[in-house]
């Protein structure tokens, strides 16, 4: 099964209930996203961002540069797929009341608000996905796994770094951050190999710094800090806090996935799919919540037994989670594809709605019961 052969094959439209004031001429064009015109005017300028073949983070950097303002004045509700055409709401603190039209990015000014668009404030996403596969033979309900992008882009290691950070095993976390090789450029791989070779030689590590490509900006910040401080833990302070939290959230996601897999393993009619990750799918929906581990969440029954087993195996304690201020939360164990429509042409056009936090790629696997050819 193939998806995302080109950006037009994967369309994502954010659903929101955000309220604006003083709607612009573009407001009617985007009312279908759920935007309301009963808001209060204020210091936040609201836009619809349409992007193609760009991550949300890349798009924000371009907007900041074009408008000559700090990217930290820009906020959005959630990161959208890169190899796709996506629509989402963004806000800029005291941003210009104008639109922007570039090759892969269109920004439509739609109004004002007294509040910003906040992370996680959208309701869900509509999807239109072209699937190159034989035929749908699966289910419109699915175990609510985190998909591969949660664990990294070209290296599926974010959860491993997060695990070692929680355990305060800073050297181990640093080794994975700096030396683990993924599907990267030859230059990047060479730099990682040099760092591994020079691991215990500060003077030689200094010579690697000028060789590090732009793609390794996080690694470069860490290595420079380590050379200066000579302390694996203190050097992590050179990395933005939100990135460190991303590693820890990735580990929470890993434990969630493993819990859900173990929970499903003994059930009936389980279908196993393996591509970059391993998934178990089932033909039923169950209304359960599974913790994203933290010191303030409590599991019960079979779920508790599984999580206790996994954390013991991983060497993670509640005290460690408390020390890293990992509070935890809950996530639905199963999800549904709402308003599902499927049409056959040369490929399968699937249209559906998912609540926020669920992955369309996981839903598609469940529907077609095939691994995705990345």
Swiss-Prot record:
Its EC number is 5.4.99.27. It catalyses: uridine(13) in tRNA = pseudouridine(13) in tRNA. Pfam families: TruD. The active site is at 81 (nucleophile). Disulfide bonds: none annotated. It comes from the Archaea. It is an enzyme of class 5 (isomerase). PROSITE patterns: TRUD, UPF0024. Keywords: Isomerase, tRNA processing. One of its GO terms (molecular function) is tRNA pseudouridine(13) synthase activity. Gene3D superfamilies: TruD, catalytic domain (3.30.2350.20). The keyword tRNA processing applies. GO terms for biological process: tRNA pseudouridine synthesis. Residues 141-340 form the TRUD domain. HAMAP family: TruD. Belongs to the pseudouridine synthase TruD family. Could be responsible for synthesis of pseudouridine from uracil-13 in transfer RNAs. This is Probable tRNA pseudouridine synthase D. It comes from Nanoarchaeum equitans (strain Kin4-M). The lineage of its organism: Archaea, Nanobdellota, Candidatus Nanoarchaeia, Nanoarchaeales, Nanoarchaeaceae. The gene is truD.
């Amino acid at each position: 099964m193939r998806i995302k052969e080109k950006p037009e094959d994967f369309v994502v439209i954010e659903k929101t209930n955000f309220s604006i004031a003083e709607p612009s001429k573009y407001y009617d064009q985007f009312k279908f996203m759920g935007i309301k015109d009963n808001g209060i005017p204020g210091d936040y300028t609201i836009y619809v961002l349409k992007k193609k073949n760009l991550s949300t983070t890349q798009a924000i950097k371009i907007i900041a540069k074009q408008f000559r303002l700090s990217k930290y004045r820009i906020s959005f509700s959630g990161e959208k797929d890169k190899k796709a055409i996506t629509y989402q709401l963004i806000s800029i603190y005291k941003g210009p009341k104008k639109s922007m039209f570039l090759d892969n990015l269109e920004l439509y000014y739609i109004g004002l608000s007294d509040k910003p668009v906040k992370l996680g404030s959208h309701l869900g996403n509509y999807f239109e996905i072209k699937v190159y596969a034989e035929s749908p033979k699966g289910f419109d309900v699915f175990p609510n796994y985190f998909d591969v992008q949660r664990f990294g882009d070209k290296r599926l290691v974010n959860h491993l770094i997060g695990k070692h950070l929680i355990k305060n095993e800073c050297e181990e976390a640093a080794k994975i951050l700096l030396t683990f090789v993924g599907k990267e450029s030859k230059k990047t791989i060479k730099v990682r190999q040099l760092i591994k070779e020079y691991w215990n030689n500060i003077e030689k590590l200094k010579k690697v710094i000028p060789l590090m490509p732009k793609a390794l900006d996080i690694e470069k910040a860490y290595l420079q800090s380590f050379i200066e401080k000579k302390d694996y833990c203190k050097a992590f302070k050179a990395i933005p806090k939100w990135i460190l939290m991303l590693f820890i959230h990735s580990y929470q996601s890993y434990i969630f996935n493993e819990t859900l897999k173990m929970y499903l393993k003994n059930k009936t009619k389980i279908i196993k799919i393996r591509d970059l990750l391993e998934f178990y799918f089932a033909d039923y929906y169950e209304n359960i919540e599974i913790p994203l581990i933290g010191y303030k969440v409590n599991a019960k029954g079979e779920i508790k037994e599984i999580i206790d087993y996994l954390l013991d195996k991983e060497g993670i304690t509640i005290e460690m989670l408390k020390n890293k201020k990992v509070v935890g939360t809950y996530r639905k164990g199963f999800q549904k594809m709402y308003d599902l429509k499927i049409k056959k042409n040369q490929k399968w056009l699937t249209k559906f709605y998912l609540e926020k936090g669920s992955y369309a790629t996981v839903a598609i696997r469940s529907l077609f019961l095939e691994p995705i050819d990345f």
